[in-house]
Amino acid sequence: MPEVTLRHEFDCDEQTYWDKTTFDQAFNERLYRDVLKFPGYELLSLVDDENAKTRRVRIDPPLGNMPAAVKKAVGDRFSYVEEGRFDKKTRRYHFQIVPSAMRDKAKTFGELYCEKLGDNRVARIARVTVEVKVFMVGGLVEEKILGDVRHSYEAAARFTREYLKELGLTA
């Protein structure tokens, strides 16, 4: 299964990273709608208990310049639900993507975690794995998804730095 690991550094502590970005509704609204230009973003649920934060988000990504074979496989409209759980003890966010099309043939899952680099500096590591089992186009779809993941995480990292600075939360 193809996998990508991305690392981005931010001038904040780990708690600020999680609270003011990953689990902050205003941040995510701006990220998905304004920065990434996704047609749809909706927080379906966020449950915070003593052990974990569990979140479900529905996302409608732009289909844009998708190869014809891929577009045929997923259809004219595509969305997905991200189901994630942040374990407060291990401080890792594990997620899976439930697509609106090809549910039995496509798997995307991963994890996010932070490494402390200093008093007010962290590296956010994102590891994403993709598997698409569709004859003839599976590899194309995997390539498209991983390319989109790389692009989205790079844009999100730039926005995260700007957003933290805008809020006065950077070191």
Model-flagged regions — what are they?
Residues 42-96:
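Glycine-rich portal/gate segments that line the openings of hydrophobic small-molecule binding cavities
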Residues 1-66:
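Hydrophobic ligand-binding cavity/cleft-lining segments
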Residues 13, 23, 76, 148, ...:
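Short amphipathic alpha-helical segments
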Residues 31-38, 88-90, 104-105:
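Short secondary-structure junctions
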Residues 53, 80, 85, 94-146:
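Beta-strand/loop substructures that line and gate deep hydrophobic ligand-binding cavities in soluble
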Residues 86-88, 139-171:
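A conserved amphipathic terminal alpha-helix motif
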Residues 1, 38-39, 77-79, 105-107:
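Short solvent-exposed loop/turn micro-motifs enriched in small/polar/acidic residues
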Residues 17-21, 126, 160:
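Hydrophobic pocket/interface hotspot
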